């Protein structure tokens, strides 16, 4: 019997558009001989709809105007337990932070990807650092900035950052993905502007020393015995891998495998699996590293529990390089969700 799978897309995060593109790719490549699919779109204002129209309209955003194929029963499909598993192809806020995972847990429906705790910790860049510091994982030096403290003690915070980190630094909203709200500061003026911008997206901001490093990504797949694909490398078109470089600028390059020695490739794979286990991840995650160009020291950058599934995304590309077809990968992560729920 075919399993019934709800594919959730859209949502209220700043990554709404990226989610639609990822979901379109999943819907076009899922094995329909194994699964009956229920596409459920969530608008930016939080309304849920089952959408049975053209997949291309999901990617473009036109699905919201396609009233004939848009049914206001999206929530009921989950609440009435009409599906066997949920695949939240939703990046960022509410999709990747433990919120939808908690809803599925309450409804006793298997959910693709890590669970509530793991998703919440991995989504929050600051808490990821706090947790992994206790495991001795090497990370870039940082300062955490709170919106309330910044408002009342701006110059003290600026001085702390300058004294501890110097320049250059990266400024990142703690709970944001796809490089939304991230900037690089080379001086005080850019630091202040970057903090103001990042605080528009989150009340908590991470400021990190900017390493002269290469960006290495590792796809991890599995539950109790996860495995890692051969690492890939991002060569950004811009100064760093910002939103434009990820989704708009064709000059960014994805190298598979990463241009590292065989020994270093293996070390990065092993470290990715260790971090996956440390954070109690499950199903899938993409673990991103920075490798210092001079010393070749490996630093954790971040973990993505719902990695991009667009046609140019690194996660599926890394597994395709291992011989795992896109549709096969989708099937495997769905089955991993069911497997974990049955234990």
UniProtKB/Swiss-Prot annotation:
Protein source organism: Clostridium novyi (strain NT)
SUPFAM superfamilies: Glutathione synthetase ATP-binding domain-like, PreATP-grasp domain
Name of this chain's protein: D-alanine--D-alanine ligase
Stored HAMAP family: Dala_Dala_lig
UniProt xrefs under InterPro entries: ATP-grasp (IPR011761), ATP_grasp_subdomain_1 (IPR013815), D-Ala_lig_Van_CS (IPR000291), D_ala_D_ala (IPR005905), Dala_Dala_lig_C (IPR011095), Dala_Dala_lig_N (IPR011127), PreATP-grasp_dom_sf (IPR016185)
Cofactor note: Binds 2 magnesium or manganese ions per subunit.
Keyword vocabulary terms for this entry: ATP-binding, Cell shape, Cell wall biogenesis/degradation, Cytoplasm, Ligase, Magnesium, Manganese, Metal-binding, Nucleotide-binding, Peptidoglycan synthesis
Catalytic activity: 2 D-alanine + ATP = D-alanyl-D-alanine + ADP + phosphate + H(+)
Annotated binding of Mg(2+) 1, by residue: 288, 302
């Amino acid at each position: 019997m075919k399993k019934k799978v709800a594919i959730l897309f859209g949502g209220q995060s700043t990554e709404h558009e990226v989610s639609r593109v990822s979901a379109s790719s999943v819907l076009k490549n899922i094995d329909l001989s194994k699964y009956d699919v229920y596409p459920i779109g969530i608008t930016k204002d939080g309304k849920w709809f089952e959408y049975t129209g053209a997949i291309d309209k999901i990617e473009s955003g036109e699905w919201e105007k396609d009233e004939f194929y848009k049914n206001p029963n999206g929530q009921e499909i989950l609440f009435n337990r009409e599906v066997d598993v949920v695949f939240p192809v939703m990046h960022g806020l509410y999709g990747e932070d433990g919120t939808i995972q908690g809803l599925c847990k309450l409804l006793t429906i298997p959910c693709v990807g890590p669970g509530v705790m793991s998703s919440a910790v991995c989504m929050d860049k600051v808490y990821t650092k706090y947790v992994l510091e206790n495991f001795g994982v090497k990370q870039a030096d940082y300062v955490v900035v709170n919106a309330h403290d910044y408002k009342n003690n701006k110059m003290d915070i600026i001085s702390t950052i300058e004294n501890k980190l110097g320049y250059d630094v990266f400024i990142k909203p703690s709970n944001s993905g796809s490089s939304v709200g991230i900037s690089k500061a080379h001086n005080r003026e850019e630091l202040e502007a970057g903090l103001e911008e990042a605080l528009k997206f989150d009340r908590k901001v991470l400021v990190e020393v900017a390493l002269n490093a290469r960006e290495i990504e590792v796809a991890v797949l599995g539950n109790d015995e996860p495995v890692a694909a051969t690492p890939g490398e991002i060569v950004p078109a811009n100064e760093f891998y910002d939103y434009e470089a990820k989704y708009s600028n064709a000059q960014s390059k994805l190298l598979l495998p990463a241009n590292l020695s065989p020994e270093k490739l293996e070390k990065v794979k092993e470290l990715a699996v260790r971090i996956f286990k440390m954070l109690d991840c499950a199903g899938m995650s993409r673990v991103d590293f920075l490798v210092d160009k001079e010393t070749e020291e490996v630093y954790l950058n971040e973990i993505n529990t719902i990695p991009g599934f667009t046609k140019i995304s690194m996660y599926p590309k890394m597994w395709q390089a291992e011989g795992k077809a896109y549709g096969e990968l989708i099937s495997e992560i769905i089955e991993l969700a069911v497997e974990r729920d049955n234990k």
